[in-house]
Structure formats: structure tokens, C-alpha cells
Amino acid sequence: MKRLLLALSCLIACAPATLLAWSNHSLGTWLALADLEELRQAEPVQVESLEAFLAAEGVALEQLLDEQEAFARENFPDYPARPDDLSWLPGSTGDRRRAFLMALRVNPEIRLASFVQALPGLQLPDHRFLPAEQVLVFRKLNLWNEWRFIALSPGERIGPLAVLASAADEPDYGHDINLFSDNPGEVGARYGFGTQPFGDARFEYSSQAPFHIGYYHESALIYRAAPFLARTYPEMRVQQYLGLARFAFESGHDYWGYRFLGWALHYVQDLTQPYHSKALPGETTATLMWTAIKAALGDTADKEAAIERVATRHTEVEKYQADWLRRLLREGSNDSPLLAAYRDRSVEGDYPPFDLGYLRNVVSLEAYEAADGFDERIGAWLAKGQPGADFSQGNQLKPPASDPELDAVLVQLIRHFSGHSRNLVRTTLRNP
């Protein structure tokens, strides 16, 4: 049995932990929240640097962060306590911004530029664009070739939806990379998260996966074989950033209220993606056990095929959905079911008010239950010969042919994405 559990553990440990869920969170957030009354009625907010926020509220932030840490230790299973030497001390000298980020246990090298994304209909004609390297910390920036970042200046006023939507993409800009003890850099050895639980620690993108994935609903046998699956931390991030958002609103720093709220929203949206809520969609405990038995006996073909299948399907469906959305926005196709899904409120009556158990018990569970059907539908689409590899006129790759059944599944998942986004934002703004 021990050998079998080891083989099963190795299979799950090798499962691909991908970088992004739903591609550009800002675009989806902009569409999902465009008609939210609480945002439509809100006044423009004044841009403020993090340094100014810390200078004004440093003493009160010490109490907030200590209370958050105590809550996490008491309420989050398998929570790795923050080392005491990382506590936020408002009177300390030195780099206050770095000290604050380390108290949150995020990557202290993140840029935190003052910016908004160039979103559909957002008019800021006299502003310059920022190069991607001033916004993201990654060495390879090709994934963000189509993103455009508009520079803002402290003191200017900007609509809160633009701030919130732009911030919803930020945690993918390096907030959670290199935080484990076996990652490059110095902070992983100090943060207390231990070694990276899954993913390939050699790649900078991979190291953020345990913060953007929530495997909360696997079977007891899976957890026994792979206890490292419990070491995921999106609940911690949501609790941190929601608390900071409410604090910022209460203390009159509305810009940071919306920005922190966008950061919290990111992790909720991540877990609406089924591949972020189930370790190996398309595999039951029984099929995983059989694959593990064969691997333990030396036949690794099924293991390698399962890993490759999940990686390919996740990657291709993300490209498909992102390309579909961008094409619709370029064409102005407002009657598309995908665009309608971002505005659709039909599922919201099924959701309870947002609380700190919501991410695990509502968002992740819903995505977990959809995972196998989603994976099967992607497989059927790919079996038709997609994605397209033929060239059209102009020597450009043809876009993948649409699949009505896959489209219907994606539309329903986007309803979930949008409904949970509105639920979180509405709850926070009504109860700051």
C-alpha cells in the first residue's frame, strides 16, 4: 500500500500547475462589474502611492495585520504561521514599503506602479503607456504582449471601476513568485511556507501556483497519498486583501480600498476555473489508482498521458476563451452569449452572501463539480483537429473553429466568474 500511495503521490505531484486562470482578469472584471450600482454611483478616487498610505496609517495597520495573523492561525487548516520577525512595525526605519510587503509575505520586488489597464471605452487621452517591465517582475514578458498599461500620477482622479478592474490582474504580475524556501531569492527562506508543495520549482511562474489554486474537495485517499495538496493559500490572500480594502475605505484611502479589493477578487476568480479547483480533471479516484498501480509496476505511459492531457486542455481552452473575447470586443459584437454572460445575473440567487468560507465552500466546490465535464468537452473539441493549424491569407494562423457545446460550457463558467465577482464587491462596498 505504501508503494501504491507513493506512486499516486508522484502522479499528482507531476500534475501541471498553470500560471493563469481566465487570461486577463482586468478585462473580465471590467465587463462583469460595469453595471454594478455601487460602482456606477461611486465618485472618482485620488491616486495615492503605497508609501503615502503607509505613512498615514502605519500605526493602525500594525493592529490590523496582527489581528489577521491571529485569525489565520486559528481558522485556516494547515496555515504556516508568519514568523514574528516579519511583523509590521510602523516606527521602524528603512524601506517601509518592503517591510509592509514582507509582513504580508508577498514578493517584495513587485513594481506596484500607479497604472490602469487600457480597457474598452476607458478614455485617458493625455496619458503615456508604461512598458511591461515597469509593471511586472517576470524576466519573460511575452505572455503580456497584448496588455497596455496607462501611467497614472499621484493626486489625479480616476474612476473606481478602472482601479478595481486593473488591480484584479495584478496578483499575476509576480506577487506570489519565489516565496518558498527552495525558490530563488532570499525571502523564501524567511517566509515560513517551507518548500514548494507542487509544480516545478525551477520555473518562476510555477512558484505562484499554491497561492492561486485551491484543492479543497479531493477524496480522502487522494489527500492521504498527496498531503501537499492541502498546502494552498488563496484563502489567506483573500482574507488579507479584503481586510486591507475595508480598512482603506474606513480610513479614507479609497484608491487603495479599490486596489486591495481587486487583489482579493483575483483569487476568487482563479478558483472559478475548474483546473484551479481539481488536481486532475477527467480522472476519478479509481482511474488515478489504476494509473498509479501501473506506474508503480514500471508502466508510466498512462501517467505521462494524463499529465500531458490536462496541461494541453487547460492551455488550449484558455487561449480559445481569450481569443474569442478579444475578437468579440474588436468586432463590437454586443449580442454574443459570451459578452452577455459577463452581465448575466441569473446564477446570483443561488449564492449565499460572501464570507470567509465562501471561497472554499461555494466557489471552489462549484468549479470542482464542473471540472470533469469541462475537461471532457475540451477533449471532444480537440479531437476534431483543433486548435487550427492551417494558414489563412496573409500567412496568419487561422483562429480555432468554434464549438457550440464548448462555448455553452464556457458561457456558464463565465456566469459563475461574474456572479462571484459581483457578490464579493457588492458585499464589501455595502459593508466596508
Regions found by a protein language model. Give the residues of each.
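Positively charged n-region of N-terminal signal peptides that target proteins for export
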Residues: M1-L4
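Intrinsically disordered, low-complexity segments enriched in polar/charged small residues
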Residues: A7-L8, W30, L271
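Bacterial N-terminal signal peptides
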Residues: A7-P16
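Residue-level signal for the start and early helices of compact helical domains
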Residues: C10, W256-F260, E308
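N-terminal, motif-rich segments that launch catalysis or mediate targeting to/interaction with membranes
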Residues: T18-F247, S277-P432
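Active-site beta-strand/loop microenvironment that shapes enzyme catalytic pockets
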Residues: A245-G282
